[in-house]
Amino acid sequence: MEAEGSSAPARAGSGEGSDSAGGATLKAPKHLWRHEQHHQYPLRQPQFRLLHPHHHLPPPPPPSPQPQPQCPLQPPPPPPLPPPPPPPGAARGRYASSGATGRVRHRGYSDTERYLYCRAMDRTSYAVETGHRPGLKKSRMSWPSSFQGLRRFDVDNGTSAGRSPLDPMTSPGSGLILQANFVHSQRRESFLYRSDSDYDLSPKSMSRNSSIASDIHGDDLIVTPFAQVLASLRTVRNNFAALTNLQDRAPSKRSPMCNQPSINKATITEEAYQKLASETLEELDWCLDQLETLQTRHSVSEMASNKFKRMLNRELTHLSEMSRSGNQVSEFISNTFLDKQHEVEIPSPTQKEKEKKKRPMSQISGVKKLMHSSSLTNSSIPRFGVKTEQEDVLAKELEDVNKWGLHVFRIAELSGNRPLTVIMHTIFQERDLLKTFKIPVDTLITYLMTLEDHYHADVAYHNNIHAADVVQSTHVLLSTPALEAVFTDLEILAAIFASAIHDVDHPGVSNQFLINTNSELALMYNDSSVLENHHLAVGFKLLQEENCDIFQNLTKKQRQSLRKMVIDIVLATDMSKHMNLLADLKTMVETKKVTSSGVLLLDNYSDRIQVLQNMVHCADLSNPTKPLQLYRQWTDRIMEEFFRQGDRERERGMEISPMCDKHNASVEKSQVGFIDYIVHPLWETWADLVHPDAQDILDTLEDNREWYQSTIPQSPSPAPDDPEEGRQGQTEKFQFELTLEEDGESDTEKDSGSQVEEDTSCSDSKTLCTQDSESTEIPLDEQVEEEAVGEEEESQPEACVIDDRSPDT
C-alpha cells in the first residue's frame, strides 16, 4: 500500500487546492475541477490523501507523536505542499443538480476499523500463502495480478445471528469491507462520471463537504444522488459540531474518526466562522431540495436510475447525430436497455396460427421427453459426466475452470458439444456441492444432459455454449477474494443453477419480437420478461422428469429459498432491467462508502440477492471482458443471430430491429457503443464492490474496446441499393428526450421528434450487440410463423421452443 500513497503530491498542479499535511484549502473554481472531464473518456486518477475533516478551517497544530499501530491502514502522509492562493470565485456552491459528483477523501481510521483490517489481513495472508479457499477443493488463482501476493481485500468473518435469512445457521461472514479504489494505471471512466447537465463538460458542482464524508475512500467520486445526500448531511453535522463547540462531547458513530484537537469559535476568525456557517446552510438546502423530489412509493435508488437514464439519453442523442450507423447503435441501446414502453401495430395472425392458438396454454411448451437416466449408473458415469475419446485433452482444458477466460468453445469440441454438462459437473465437484446437498451423481448428469438438450443447437448465440460460459464466469466471480466466505452454500448453488437455466429453450429472437408478433408466450406472461419467465418455467419443469430432481434431498425450506433466489436472479437477466439493476448496485456501494464504517454488511435478503443478481448479470455481459479471440467469436455469433431475426422481420414486412439488418449494420461501432454505455459502467461498479479483484478484467475490457475502435471504417457506410432494405436507415435520426418524467414512470421514455418505432424486437431482450445477450429474446412466434411460411411440417413437433404448439413427446 506504500506505492498507492506515493502519488498524493502529484495533484499539486491539477487546478484543485492543494492540501497540507494537517488541513485543506478552498478548492479552485469549478471550471478547473476535474479538467480531464473535457476528454471524451476522462481518466480516473484517485489519490490517497489525509485531510482534516473541518477543511474549511485553518489546520490545527500538529498532534504529539503517536505510537504506530501494528497494522496501519494508510501510508505516511505526503510532505506538506504550499497551498496556492484561492482565486476569485473559489467559494464552493452546493450541488446544482443531482448530477453533481462528490469527492470522498480519507480522514483516518478508528480502532474498530484497524481491528477489522488487521484481522482480515491475517486471514488474507493465510489464504495467499496456502491457496486456501473454503468450500473449494483446489486453490484458486483466478486473479493473478490482483490477488497473489497482495493483501488488499477484506471480508469480516465475524458471526452475526440471522445475517442470512436463507440459512442463518450456516451463514458465513458478516460483511464485505469496501476498499478504496487505487487505480494502478490511468483508466477511462464511464459516462456515469461525466456531468449530469447538458452542454457542460465539467461537474456542475462538487459538494464542498462531500469530500470529507468517508474515512476509507479517499478520492472516490460519488455519483448516485442518495449517497451524495448522505455525504452532504455528514458534512453538515461536522460543521454544526464545529460551529457550536459540540465536538468535545462523547463521540457517536457519526463523529469524525480521526483524533483531532478541539476547535471552538475562538480558534478561527469571524470571517471564516461566517463562511462556514453560510456554506453549511447551503449544503443543507441542497439536501432538502433533493429529498423533496423523492416519492414515497419509489426507492432511493430510483434517483440514481433516473439520473443514469437521463445521462445515457444525452449520450445516445449525441451519438445518433454523428452518423447513420451511430443512430442505429443508439436506437439499439435505447430500445434494449432502457425498458421503454412500445406502441406497436400487431400483425394479423395467419390461419394456421389461429388454429394452433386454440390449443390450451396449460402446458409449458418446449419441454421434450428425453431418456438419459436409463443408461446411467454410478459405476458407468465418465470422469467428466460425458463420454469422450479425448478425455485427457479435456482434462487439460478444464484445469482453467477456475480462471477468467476459459476457452469454452474448445471445451464444447472436446466434449461432443456437451460443454454445459461438463462444466457444471466439474464445478459441482470443485465446490463439493454433491456432498453438501446429497445430490446423486447420476441424477445430476441426467438433469444436466436433459437441460442441455433443451438449448437449441441451431441458435447461434443463445445456446448451450453461452450457458456454459455464463456458469463458468459466475463460478469465478463467486471465487473472487473479496467475496470469500460471504455467501452460503445454498446461495452459491442458486447462483450457479440460475446461470445454467437462464437461457434454456431460447429460440433466437428477442422479447420484443415475441410481443410484436402476438406470440403465445407473450400472452401467457403479459409481455413482461417473456423469455426470462419461460426459461425459469422450463428449467424447473425439467426437475420433474425421471431421475432429474437434483434438489430431492433439500429440506422444504431450502427448496423454497433456492427457488426464490433462482427466480429473482434469472428475471434480473432481462436486459431491459439493466439500468435499474446498475443504479441499485451503485447506490448500495456508494451509500456504504460515505458512511463511517464503509462496511457492506449484506445482512438482509435484499442486499444479498442484489449482489448475486448483478454477479450473474455481469457474467451474462462478460464477453467483452474475455480474451479478444473469444470475444470476437461471441460477437460473430450474436450478430448472426440478430441478422436471422432481421431476415424474418423482413419476410413478414415488419420494421427491422436495430442492429438486425445485415445490409447496413455497423458491427464494430456497435461493440464500442455497447462497451461504453452498457458493459463498462456495469463492470466499473462491480470492480468498486470487489476492489481490487476485477482490475485485470477492466484492463482487458479497455484493450478490447480499443481494438474494435481501431477497426471502425473511417468513411461512412454507403446507403443500401435496395430501398426496401434501407428504409430504416432513411428514417429521421433517432432522438432521445433529455429529461425523465417525475411521475414515477421512470422507465418510460418517449422519443422526441422521431418516427422510429421501438417495437423492433432486437432491443428489449438480452441481445447485446456485442456480446452475450441476455435471456430476453425468445422467438416463439417467430418460429411458429416460420413454420407456417415454410413447407408443411405440422406433423413435426419443434423441440425448438416455447411456442404455442404443444410440447414434444
UniProtKB/Swiss-Prot annotation:
Its EC number is 3.1.4.53. It comes from Homo sapiens. Inhibited by rolipram. Activated by phosphatidic acid. GO terms for cellular component: apical plasma membrane; calcium channel complex; centrosome; cilium; cytosol; membrane; nuclear membrane; nucleoplasm. Hydrolyzes the second messenger cAMP, which is a key regulator of many important physiological processes. The keyword Electron transport does not apply. This is 3',5'-cyclic-AMP phosphodiesterase 4D. Its cofactor is Zn(2+); Mg(2+); Mn(2+). Long isoforms that share a conserved PKA phosphorylation site in the N-terminus are activated by PKA through phosphorylation. Isoform 3 and isoform 7 are activated by phosphorylation (in vitro), but not isoform 6. Binds 2 divalent metal cations per subunit. Site 1 may preferentially bind zinc ions. Gene3D superfamilies: 3'5'-cyclic nucleotide phosphodiesterase, catalytic domain. The gene is PDE4D. Zn(2+) 1 binds at residues 466, 502-503, 620.
